[in-house]
C-alpha cells in the first residue's frame, strides 16, 4: 500500500507515552462486511470517540488482522472510514505499519524478528506435499489474498468430526516439526470465506496476533492491565487472552464463543465503543 493511497483518510495524532493500547481484529469486528445504516453510524461513533479522546486519554489504536494492508484500505473505502489507526499489524500480524501525518513506516524491529526465522515458501510447500502424499489431506490455496512474504493461506474442507481432528492434528504436527507456526480456525462465511472450511495459515514462529500484543505493550511500555482487545473468531481468542480486557464482539462466531466467555452486548464497533467508554479514563 503506497503512501498516496492513504491520503483519503485522516491520521490520528502521535500519542506521547500512551497509557492504553486497543487491539482490534478488522474483518467482522471493526469492519462489518454487510454494511448497513446502523453499522455506518456505529463506526462513525467509535471513530469520533477515538479521535476526540486518543490524546487526552493517551490511547494507542491498532488493527491486528489476517488481511493485507491493501485489502484493509479497500475495505476502508467501501465502509466509509474516516481515520486510519496508529498501526496496522497485517497479514496475520506478520508485518507492522505505523501511520502519521508524516506518512507510513514499517517496524524494523519486527521485520528483524521475521528475517531471523526459518520460514520459507519452500518449507510450506514441503509440508503441503507431505500432507497430500502421506495423509491424503488436501489444502486449497487462498488465491484471493495474493502474495505475502511471511504468510501462506490455505483452506481445509471440513469432512466429519473425527477426520477433521486427525487432519488438523497432522497439520499442526508437521508445522511444528518444520519449525513453522500455523494458525487454524473455522472460516467465517460473513467475511467472504467458504462454508464448512477451516483457515490454515502458515506463518513464522513467534509471530501472529498474540505476539503482536506482547511486542507492542513492551515497545510502548504499556501496562497489560491497560490493554484491550476485540475480535469475532477463533483466531482472535489467543490475542484476547493476552490483554487485560479481551472481548468478543456480540456478533462473534459460535467457535469463538465456545473458547472465550467475555463478550460485548453490542456487535462490531458498537461493542468496542461500549467497553472503551466504560473502562478508559484519564
Report each predicted region and the residues it spans.
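Short loop/turn segments at strand-loop or loop-helix junctions that form parts
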Residues: 22-29, 91-93, 146, 155-157
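Non-catalytic pre-domain segments flanking phosphatase-related domains
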Residues: 1-26, 30-34, 45-52
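Conserved acidic, metal-coordinating active-site core of Asp-based
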Residues: 130-228, 235-238, 242
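Mg2+-dependent phosphoryl-transfer enzymes with acidic/Ser/Thr/Gly-rich catalytic loops
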Residues: 4, 17, 203-282
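Short, surface-exposed amphipathic charged segments that create phosphate/polyanion-binding patches used
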Residues: 99-110, 198-201, 278-282
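The start of beta-strands in P-loop NTPase/AAA+ ATPase cores
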Residues: 20-22, 86, 227
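Glycine-rich phosphate-binding "P-loop"
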Residues: 30-38, 200-204
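Active-site phosphate-binding/coordination module
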Residues: 3-6, 41-142
Amino acid at each position: 500500500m503506497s503512501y498516496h493511497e492513504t491520503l483519503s483518510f485522516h491520521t490520528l495524532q502521535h500519542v506521547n507515552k500512551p497509557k492504553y493500547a486497543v487491539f482490534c481484529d478488522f474483518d467482522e469486528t471493526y469492519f462489518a462486511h454487510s454494511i448497513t445504516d446502523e453499522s455506518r453510524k456505529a463506526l462513525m461513533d467509535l471513530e469520533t470517540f477515538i479521535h476526540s479522546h486518543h490524546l487526552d486519554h493517551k490511547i494507542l489504536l491498532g488493527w491486528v488482522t489476517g488481511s493485507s494492508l491493501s485489502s484493509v484500505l479497500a475495505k476502508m473505502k467501501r465502509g466509509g472510514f474516516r481515520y486510519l489507526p496508529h498501526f496496522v499489524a497485517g497479514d496475520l500480524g506478520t508485518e507492522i505499519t505505523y501511520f502519521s501525518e508524516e506518512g507510513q513506516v514499517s517496524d524494523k524491529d519486527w521485520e528483524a524478528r521475521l528475517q531471523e526465522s526459518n520460514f520459507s515458501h519452500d518449507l510450506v510447500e514441503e509440508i503441503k506435499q507431505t500432507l497430500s502424499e502421506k495423509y491424503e489431506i488436501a489444502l486449497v490455496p487462498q488465491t484471493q489474498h495474493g502474495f505475502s512474504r511471511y504468510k501462506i493461506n490455505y483452506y481445509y474442507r471440513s469432512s466429519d468430526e473425527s477426520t477433521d481432528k486427525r487432519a488438523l492434528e497432522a497439520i499442526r504436527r508437521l508445522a511444528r516439526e518444520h519449525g513453522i507456526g500455523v494458525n487454524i480456525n473455522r472460516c467465517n462465511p460473513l467475511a467472504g470465506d467458504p462454508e464448512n472450511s477451516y483457515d490454515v495459515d502458515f506463518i513464522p514462529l513467534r509471530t501472529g496476533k498474540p505476539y503482536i500484543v506482547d511486542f507492542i505493550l513492551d515497545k510502548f511500555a504499556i501496562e497489560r492491565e491497560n490493554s484491550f482487545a476485540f475480535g469475532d473468531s477463533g483466531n482472535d481468542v489467543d490475542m484476547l487472552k493476552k490483554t487485560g480486557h479481551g472481548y468478543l464482539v456480540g456478533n462473534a462466531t459460535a467457535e469463538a464463543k465456545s473458547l472465550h466467555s467475555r463478550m460485548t452486548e453490542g456487535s462490531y464497533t458498537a461493542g468496542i465503543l461500549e467497553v472503551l467508554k466504560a473502562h478508559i479514563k484519564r
